[in-house]
Amino acid sequence: MAAAALWQPQEEGLREICTLLDAHISPNSDQARIWQQLQHYSQFPDFNNYLVFLLARGEGKSFEARQAAGLLLKNNLRATFSSMPPASQQYVKSELLPCIGATNKAIRSTVGTVISVLFQIVRVAGWIELFQALHQCLDSNDLDHMEGAMDAIYKICEDVPEELDVDVPGLPERPINVFMPRLLQFFQSTHAILRKLALGCINQYIVVMPAALYMSMDQYLQGLFNLAKDPSADVRKLVCSAWVQLIEVRPSILEPHLKNVTELMLQANKDSDDEVALEACEFWSAYCDVSMPPEGLREFLPRLIPTLLSNMSYSDDDESLADAEEEESFPDRDQDLKPRFHASRLHGSETGEDDDDDDAVNVWNLRKCSAAGLDVLSNVFGDDILPTLMPLIQQNLARTDDDAWKEREAAVLSIGAIAEGCITGLYPHLPQIVAFLIPLLDDKFPLIRSITCWTLSRYSKFIVQSLEHPNGREQFDKILLGLLRRVLDTNKRVQEAACSAFATLEEEAAEELVPHLGIILQHLMCAYGKYQRRNLRILYDALGTLADAVGAELNQAKYLDIFMPPLITKWQQLANSDKDLFPLLECFTSIAQALGPGFSQFAEPVFQRCINLIQSQHLAKVDPAAAGALYDKEFIVCALDLLSGLAEGLGAGIESLVSQSSLRDILLQCCMDEAADVRQSALALLGDLSRVCPIHLHPRLQEFLNVAAKQLNPQCVKEAVSVANNACWAIGELAIKIGKEISPVVITVVSCLVPILKSPEGLNKSLLENSAITLGRLCWVCPDIVAPHMDHFMQAWCNALCMIRDDFEKEDAFHGLCAMVAANPTGAVGSLTFICQACASWNEIKSEGLHNEVCQILNGYKQMLGSGGWEQCMSTLEPAVVQRLGRYGV
């Protein structure tokens, strides 16, 4: 301590740093230059001493400059504390403690933040004095000191709650055991800020549940009940948050109190403060998600449903209302462009999720939470909610005056929210619902037009299912044309909702769209000419979805002439560094796959652009100035995925493009990229090229195989399962094309696939299926290498084969199974029941050759075992399995 106390700042250094901090907080300063100067000062070993001195003792300096010193100190400590001289470390710690109760709130708060960051580095044992100081502040009865201590404790609880629940040499008890009674006492404080901070601290422990909280649970719950009507909205919000967390992670604790808690949450859901109501509203979804007995909620439905419906109306200050009137002539601002995320290509089971968002602006609010709650309730209680809900909806819809448009809009939203859960009761009335919604597409209020688009999209699946019903086609046509009409709306919010809804309808309708292709394309391309950047992204998605839905039907000159010229014009206009290329690349990927060989007339410039994009990004990675752009891996991912789409669409027709390019070397580089999503897309392309032109991979074949095999080691699988999935698939594709040339990596790959096949739940279904298929392909082409090891994997492999649907990939895997048995029939006999189950998993083997092979194997075993042994084997199988095996003549 003595050495630390000797440190004193030099006046000149202090003055320079103060001047710099004053400039730093000035709005008109050159921040880049100031940042450089701060970096220069940070090289000095005692720079942090100056910062903590200014924060703690900067009397006469502006509070803003002292705060800036504290925030700079916080960031520096994160990066440099462990390398600071011990005397400086001690000085920083000792200067912070007296400031916990600083009279200025901003300084107190900054000190609490710095303490929390420093605590994360040194932990309890490295700063025992902190806890002594916090106790003294809590016991001081001075509000500034109590609040400062509570603020610091709250920030520690928020960042590392588990660190207070540890035994520490030198302390008689765990810190949380000492703090917990004090925190619970503060529930009764006359100061709202102390009640809020105490409750906030304890709430951080609901998930980790230390003994200190578990043993005080009755007192904590009683405190929550007492604070439910607290005058402070912040406190009431935290009470609701506590109930939501408890029901999510400790529902058994709430069960005895559930009725009382539900009543309180129902009241809180009507709170005059929207944030309290929003927190309370989360309770209903949480209740249903943890599978609490629904009967406990049923008696509240007659009061809960009207509350949810009431809260689904736009509030007057909802920020969505601000841009609701924005016409297409308004230029998009950069902040209007939501960040977009491209999903890298994945081979295997599809895991895409619907985005049922009813609002263009993704801000979670009471309206959306209420709609989500109604959706969840409809899925739990089904049609039972309709007698309460439908009269309320009808009542709101009957209010046709302009002042009631928000209530009408909420009614339409609620019809959409219950589309899945209440469909049994609603399905007979679908024609009336649709007939009612169609005119609302032309409502004078744009937000009613937009929500009607969304609600119709929620019923798309059922509308398509009704096509063969009387008037079903007429109903479908009206919806299709109605949505297309709104795609051309002049309001940007309506355009967005209509385009998204139309994409959903496309997914459900698929080939039913074919008779309407001309009119669909005319509308979409008319919109293409008038949309601004944000809605263009959604339009690209609608075009890509259309291509996925109708496939080769799009490959007709009359259609190509409508949509390809505008797309190509845009493609040529956009620079290689323009992020508006992303959705266009994705759109072209779907179009290339749909058109197949029909895309060949457009392929060469598209292929070359993809190569250029990847090369320019590789350059940007090492030399942004030479590339003229900053590195952005998403360009590489999108370009690789479009090349995959070309390979899939053109098939062997891509060979001439690949042979004249440097794609092979570029692809190998991408397969080794440090970014998982780049490797994922690169390995997908490797698999696609293996299918259509493996000859061009040959010069670097072993390198590709080694890189792909490396992605299957257990650590890589754990870190990036989707990369492993694509690597596995690519190796399987290569195996059937190159045969014995794959032998150098066979044992490495098999040794990685076996743990995947044997793993209990938790591994991705797609990886499991691809592992079973690739193992089968390796067994097929190199049976002599794999057969000696079959007892390690046969049973797990057969179990996985049972899960795979009938297709050519399953056929390949079964060729491998037959090759294994042929190579070592006695070695496989111990797994015979599993082999039988796998053979019985086929609905029908289309390949006559494979069917005969399976017959041969099973009959061979029947002869080997004799009738007694065979009957014994059959007796262990389900009767349905034995019956299916009859198809193979056994």
UniProtKB/Swiss-Prot annotation:
Domain Importin N-terminal as annotated: residue spans: 34-102
Annotated HEAT repeats reside at 13-39, 44-82, 91-124, 130-167, 177-207, 220-247, 259-286, 302-380, 388-419, 431-458, 476-509, 517-550, 558-596, 604-652, 663-694, 702-739, 747-783, 791-824, 833-865
**Gene Ontology annotations for the cellular component aspect, listed alphabetically:** cytoplasm; nucleoplasm
Q: Quote the SUPFAM superfamilies the UniProt record gives.
A: ARM repeat
* Sequence segments annotated as region (Disordered): 316-336
Keyword set includes Iron-sulfur: no
Origin: domain of life: Eukaryota
Molecular-function GO term, any one? small GTPase binding
Checking SMART domains in the record gives: IBN_N (SM00913)
Quote the InterPro entries the UniProt record gives. ARM-like, ARM-type_fold, HEAT, Importin-beta_N, Importin_beta
Subcellular location, in the record's words? Cytoplasm; Nucleus, Nucleoplasm
Matches recorded under PROSITE patterns: IMPORTIN_B_NT (PS50166)
Keyword Transport among record annotations:
yes
Q: Which family does it belong to?
A: Belongs to the importin beta family. Importin beta-2 subfamily.
Q: What is this protein called?
A: Transportin-1
Organism annotation: Oryza sativa subsp. indica (Rice)
